Amino acid sequence: PASPSSRLYTYDGLYDVVNVHFDNGAAGFGVYQFTLIRRPGQPQLGLSIVQFVGNLKKKGLARPNLLLEDISQGQENWPVCVVNEVDGDPAPTNFTYIPNIKYPKWFSHVLPQGCDCEGGCSDETNCSCVSKNGGELPYNEKGYIIRDKKVVYECGSSCRCSSNCSNRVSQKGLRYQLEVFKTKNRGWGVRSVNPIQPGGFICEYTGELLSDAEAEQRVENDEYLFELGNNCNLESTDGGLQLKNMSTTMISSMNEDIGYTIDAKCMGNVARFINHSCSPNLFAQNVLYDSDDLRFPHVMLFAMENIPPMRELTYDYNYTVGQVLDASGNIKSKACYCGASDCKGRLY
């Protein structure tokens, strides 16, 4: 869970003690004081990154190596800039930015039955949305998801509660200032200028909604295809956000002849640039607010741990090795370069 003090603590590397001495501290008591030297070859100091970000905001400094001020073209709550500090590649603009899912002509939402709450919903009220969520609100008072669920039911347009209801979180768009940046060996990635606490909402995975039959005709786009109900976190846990070893299982009601997929190859948002990791810091969560149809959940990405500024955001693509095929039915293979200590070596 998030820290009650709202302070963000981050791991900052390994240090060797090179000297120790006993002296009087500021309060007049004797204390041991240590001289530390940081071991070489580790990532940049978290403190220096925080100071860099603070200077950008405080002094209004221009973002170094900026390629594009806002790839969303004003469609998000924050500008999503593009930065390349690695090579001479231009900004990736070969797609149409859409902040919401692009539905096909045949699709129509069946509005859910909304709650009758006035003002905001709470666990203590006789709220139908609270009942859908197992008798508790999925978010705390600061808008952080409390625990992973099979499905989170947010209040929507059918509900009488206000737009400021604490059960309306992911539908409001970006909460953090994200930027697209060029990685050294994995193409483009995404990071946040702001610190993120566990349970913080990052973004929705948007794109074109396709039937699985249509998606199979776009096998060349496999790294942009997100199968609804298959990659999301569908098994709830009892330990809150202890999600590092989270398993994924299909909801039985989704096991139908017709499945659906989101394709972000030609249309998508900042989520299309978020890379895979075998040890991710984000997880995918099914969310419903404009329908109760489990076949068409919104795929929302949330933080599963404290994430300091400028650290790459990642989630587990959840591919099964040997199950990704090309147009001819041959098994495809791709190496994984996530760099995690428990990296599986192959993305698929």
Protein language model regions, located:
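Short peripheral tails and domain-boundary helices/loops at the edges of structured domains
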Residues: 15-25, 218-242, 330-348
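Intrinsically disordered, low-complexity acidic/polar tracts
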Residues: 37-39, 45-140
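Short coil-to-beta-strand transition motifs
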Residues: 4-16
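Acidic/histidine-enriched ion/cofactor-binding microenvironments in catalytic or ligand-binding pockets
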Residues: 194-195, 296-316
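Cys/His-rich Zn2+-coordinating "finger/knuckle" modules used by eukaryotic regulatory proteins
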Residues: 96-175, 328-348
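Short solvent-exposed strand/turn elements
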Residues: 21-46
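Catalytic cores of histone-lysine modification enzymes
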Residues: 168-291, 295, 305
